[in-house]
Each structure stands twice: as structure tokens, then as C-alpha cells.
């Protein structure tokens, strides 16, 4: 199957699979979909609460986005829904601009994702450096962790306390630590212990579901004074309904930055999840179709009252381990959650808030990637470590928009510095090598000078062109460009200045082995016509021979 094809992979599976193959696989996908729904249920509720919205909105997201992305997506096994990466972003948007702002930002993100897919930009995600993704992921993990301490300890804040930013949350924690509720701590610790130890008991039943059941049972059984979801939220059961909030052009303009952030994060998370899944099932996803599906799924989610969604690595891994191999598993997972929403959602009111906090603490720990973080700090270059730490810090102190923007800017600057340092300009008068261009030792006439440029000629290194000099007796200057893969406008300007310098000193300029892109740039700039087509020689031997011939003709003419 073509990786860059803009066609849902489900359609290709149905078209190219035999009836016998489908008959064997579909039952496995149905079972896997049910298992994944069990995993997704507590996570969807917990992540919705962490995002500052109602618990049922997490299920809306898993149902609508989960179904649409599975149906239209480019991955066989991707499971999409609310993820921890979006929690802090969504919470900030909802706190400042309400659900209308979130809808506007997500629609912007959805349109961007669809366009990215249709324009086949899926492969561009690989240009986001590992240091940036590691830094902001660890930063998000810290913000989630800080945000759950209040509920884990059962703290009580005075009315009007603002806790949107991480720094505000830390200040509020310090100011109200004396209000700790030890009964809430007990529930939270028990649930954390279950989450850590349950995988040793059973890998089939998710520990988060067991923690929810045990936590919900502890509060009434022991008469504990602990806040539950029902104490803080109004639970709404029933089918999600299509909503069209009033959105103004000004609101879309205000939410543009948030929309771009959601789109970038959704693209990175979803395609990373696809890559991880591909490595397990030995398959290949269609990155561009996956982006289109993510865009449609996100727009559908918010129009049905949900929040942004993306591919969830943990749920996708659960799908793979359970035998899911087609998008039918993701669609079944959404259908099962829909049944839970309609018939069992009122029971979610019994879940204690410390249980939700415990689940999110485990999510934060798992997504932090602290081992990779520490490994990078110990082994990466100083520039890479600086980018990592700065992205991490800015994510916590400010927001993801600032972190990614600054991180990418620093990465680009460091990359240009590295490339410019690798570009060299060196002169020679006698040179020998054994490459395919050279078959003999080069002896240069005294009046011929050669400079060799190795590396891309762009604005980061053009100052080195000014280091080229000629002697009083120099008549011909050969610029060997076989090691120049690319030439930009600033590099072109440097060559024009070099030409003027040579003209002022009575020196003829010759170019040797200009590669395709630099040659095309010089032609477009009119530089080839200025210097003369005959002065561009195919290799260094030909250039030296041309200079020698010109010198001989000048001597005869004299």
C-alpha cells in the first residue's frame, strides 16, 4: 500500500483483503476494541477533568474523534482520543476564553491538519528535533503532576484563587498546604499503589479501572469525607449532540496561536504513535491521510462538545497487544464508549477526585520520559542540552506556544552555526588526491590561484568568501565548487562581490565543477552571463587547462 496515498487505509484493507482474511481478523478487532475501551474509559474521564471540562466531554472526544479518525485514518491500529499532551493547553484556553475559544482554536487546528495532509506535508514532522519533543513532553508531564497535587492531598482553596498557570498552582499549594485532607491522601495512596502493582497481577485488566472501582467503593464503605466527581461536576448522560456556537472572526484571530499549537502537537503525537505502532506490527502508515483524519476528527469532536484529540500511544499499544490489526478495532472502541456514556455515565459521579489525581500522576510519569531526558542531558552537545532545558522550562513557566517557538528558533540558529562551521574555503597551489576527477598531479602556473569551497554557501558563512585574496602576479582565480551542494541569495551576493574584487585587480574568474543547484541559482541571477559561460568548467583539470591556454594565448599576443 502506498504510504503517501490520500485514501483511508480501511478502504484499502477491505478492497485488498480476501473474505477469509476479514472473517478471521474482524472478531479479533472487536475483542481488541472492547479491551481498549476499558483502558480508555477512566483515562478519558481523568483527562477531561485535567483539561478543565466536564468528565463526559472526555468520552465525547474518545467517541467522536476516536471513530472518525479510525474510519478515515492512515494507520491500521491507531487509537485516538483525549491525551495528556493537550490537558494544559485546553485548560488554559477554557479558563481564559471559554468553550467558544476552544472550539475556534480546534477548528483552526483541524483545518490546518487537513491542509497539511492534502499538501502531503506529513513527512515534515521529522524536522521537529528530538530535543524539543522531549523537552516539551517532560514539561507537560510536570504541569500535569503539579495540577494533581491539590486533589491528591484534598486541599481546599479560598474562593477566587487563580490556578491557571503552573506558577499560580505552586503558589496556591504552598499557601494552602495546611488544609490537607488525610482521608483523601489515603484514597490517593491506595489508588497509586494499585496502579503500580496491578500490572504484576494481571495485564488483561487495566490498573486504572481497578483503581476507579476500589476508590469509588472506599468512600461510602468507610464513610470518608472525600470529594467525588459528583460533588464538583454535573454528570450528563446521553448521546452527544451537534453544537454550533457563535464564533466571530475576532475570536478566530485571537485563537490563531493556540490553533497552530494544537495542530503541531496533534501532528507530532499522532504520527509518533503511528511510527511506534508500525515498528510492532511491521506495517506502514499513510502519514498524510492520518493528518487529514486527525483534522476531521478534531473538528468533529469540538462540534459535538468534545476537546482536541490525537493518537494515544498507550491505547494504541493496548490495541496492538490485544490483537487489533484494522481500524475496525478503533471504531468498536468508540461504539463501546458510547454505550457506557448512555447507560453507565451516572456512576462516574462516585469516583473520588484523589483517584483521578492518582491516574493522572501515573500518566504524567509515563509521558515524562525522564530516562531519555537524563540521557540527553548526559550525552548530547551543549547546544542540544540548552535547547532541551529551555523548552522544558518554558513549557512549565509560560506555555507550549512559547516553548516550541523559542526551541525551534534556537535549533535553527544552532544548526546554521554548525553548518557554517563545517563550510571551509581553502586555497592551494599544488594539490594531489585520488578521486575520480584527478588522474595526475596538478602543477599550477605561478599566475593561477585556486580556492576550494566545501559546504553550503548560505548567509551563515559568506564572510569567508571575503578571505579569498589574490597576489600581485595573479591573473586567473579558479573557484572549485564541487563540494558546494547549495547556494542561496546571500551566497550569490558574495560571489558577485568576489567578481567585482577580481575585476578591480585585473584577475579573471573561473569556476570549476558547479553543482546543479548552485549553477541554476547563478544562471537565474544572471551571474553566468556576467562571468561568461566559457568560464564555468566541468572539473578542476579542465579549469586549469583553460587558464593555461588563456595564458599562452596572452603571451603569444604580447
What are these regions (language model features)?
Residues 335, 518-519, 538:
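Short secondary-structure capping/turn micro-motifs that flank functional sites
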Residues 366-530, 548-558:
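The feature marks cytosolic C-terminal regulatory regions of anion transporters and related permeases
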Residues 79, 511, 536:
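Conserved SAM-binding loop
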Residues 530-546:
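Short acidic-hydrophobic, aromatic-tinged amphipathic segments that line or gate anion-handling sites
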Residues 1-430, 445, 473, 494, ...:
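Transmembrane helical cores of multi-pass ion-transport proteins
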